[in-house]
Regions:
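N-terminal signal peptide c-region/cleavage motif recognized by signal peptidases
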Residues: 15-17
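N-terminal, post-signal peptide beta-strand-biased segments of exported outer-membrane/organellar beta-barrel
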Residues: 19-127
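Outer-membrane beta-barrel porins/channels
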Residues: 21-46, 116-446
């Protein structure tokens, strides 16, 4: 176990160092609680193209269906840590911008409470905000221009505590039903600003405007999950997974200002200030509605040899509102509305033969594809767009310690957006370590 914690410490230190030294410019992350890339951004999901709802095993933790924790074996302690490196290319109007980022994808653990009750806890990145966009436009009837600068940074993390139960399980080769739930704590902050900067030979007589907002999130959400397994003969098993994210209104704390200023040399001097909240106060509370989310997964497995799986997910984001309770929205009418979100993923491959005599036979080789109809719909003068994403990925599993632990290496490509607006192409490499230790064992001595 000491080796496991040593590897964990080194991986955590490396991941935090990479995160501190790199960033990714994602303009779409300026809306709502920013870009939620789960589950595809984690190596567990990426190894099969984003398939997660019907997957469960004794040597890894799947936080995307809480019912899967019930597959953890008695006397076991499973610990997972994963990281991801991403190289992105943003295409905007024929211009390309490249970025590189490293993130700690997940830290999870799971262990049994009783033979029928298992528990899990972990930390996941829920969303990330990182963008800076500059647009320069002429002012009608003048020789001056106005430069609009969009800035944003921050992110939301998710700490979860989950429990799963064997509703019925008559033994190996018999049908089984597992049920579980996750209690999620979302926390973090997102800072956004828009600056209207007048560009001229002498800007001393121009009043610039800045809108800025900081949103602090601290909320509890819930996920529910079911997993049913039906043996088909002696060799095959059909699994059906169902998940549900409970809809609710999230209370968030905001701090916002809209003010004008002038610049003399390198100094800014504030003139007039508007407080968007009710009353003469920069701090206020607003509401963000979190919609229902439903996930359904099907998989067919042949005796721990190969697997094929299909996922479908739906979230009715249309009608979702942002900055409720604010008399004067900080960012005004941005032309953005939310659209229903759909995701489909298909994956499979050789998952490894644990009894194979050659090591290559115990290795796993999997892959998959996914398509997602995005959360945002842009209502622009030239037409309507939905922001869609598609991607492909591969995964290689290296078993360790007689198959109780494993190292998963993944690689993937995804494309988000459109050529008519903005397109973000991402190459990613993931690394996940799952350690399955035998705890809670009473040793016998003669």
């Amino acid at each position: 176990m000491k080796k496991c914690f040593a590897i964990f410490s080194m991986a955590l230190t490396f991941s935090l160092a990479v995160m501190a030294q790199s960033s990714t410019n994602v303009p779409f992350s300026q809306y709502g609680l920013s870009m939620n890339t789960l589950p595809v951004s984690t190596p567990l999901a990426e190894s099969m193209g984003g398939v997660v709802f019907s997957r469960a095993g004794s040597n890894f933790v799947n936080p995307f269906n809480p019912a899967s924790y019930a597959s953890i074996q008695p006397e076991s302690f499973v610990f997972d840590i994963a990281m991801s490196l991403q190289s992105s290319r943003l295409n905007e109007g024929g211009q390309q911008y490249k970025d590189f980022a490293g993130t700690l994808s997940s830290i999870t653990l799971a262990f049994p409470i009783t033979s029928w009750w298992k528990t899990s806890a972990g930390l996941l990145p829920y969303s990330k905000t990182e963008y800076r966009t500059v647009m320069t436009q002429p002012i009608a009837g003048t020789t001056q221009n106005v430069k609009t600068i969009y800035d944003g940074t921050g992110g939301i993390s998710q700490f979860y505590w989950g429990n799963a139960f064997n509703v019925w399980n008559d033994g190996e080769g018999k049908p089984s039903l597992q049920a579980g739930f996750n209690l999620n704590y979302l926390y973090g902050s997102v800072a956004r600003a828009i600056t209207y900067d007048f560009v001229a030979s002498d800007t001393s007589f121009f009043q610039d405007t800045r809108r800025q907002q900081e949103t602090r999130v601290s909320n509890i959400t819930f996920d529910l999950g079911l997993l049913y397994r039906q043996p088909l003969g002696e060799k095959y098993t059909l699994s059906v997974g169902l998940t549900c994210g409970v809809p609710q209104s999230l209370k968030v704390d905001d701090k916002a200002l809209i003010y004008t200023f002038v610049t003399y040399g390198s100094s800014e001097y504030t003139l007039d200030t508007i407080f968007p909240a009710r009353g003469n106060n920069s701090e206020y509370e607003s509401t963000l509605r979190q919609p229902l989310s439903i996930g359904l997964g099907l998989s067919l497995e042949r005796n721990q040899r190969w697997m094929v799986a299909l996922d479908a997910a739906y979230s009715p984001y249309s009608g979702m509102k942002y900055e409720e309770g604010v008399e004067t929205p900080v960012f005004g009418n941005s032309g953005i509305c939310y659209a229903d979100n759909y995701r489909i993923a298909f994956g499979g491959g050789w998952i490894g033969n644990p009894t194979a005599t050659r090591y290559i036979g115990r290795m796993g080789l999997t892959g998959g594809v996914h398509y997602e109809k995005g959360k945002l719909a842009l209502a622009l003068a030239s037409g309507d767009w939905t922001l869609d994403e598609w991607g492909v990925s591969l995964g290689i599993t290296f078993p360790m310690r007689k198959g109780r632990s494993q190292l998963v290496v993944t690689g993937g490509y995804s494309s988000f957006g459109s050529n008519d607006l903005l397109r973000n192409d991402v190459l990613s490499v993931g690394l996940a370590l799952s350690s399955n230790e035998r705890w809670f064992v009473k040793r016998k001595y003669n």
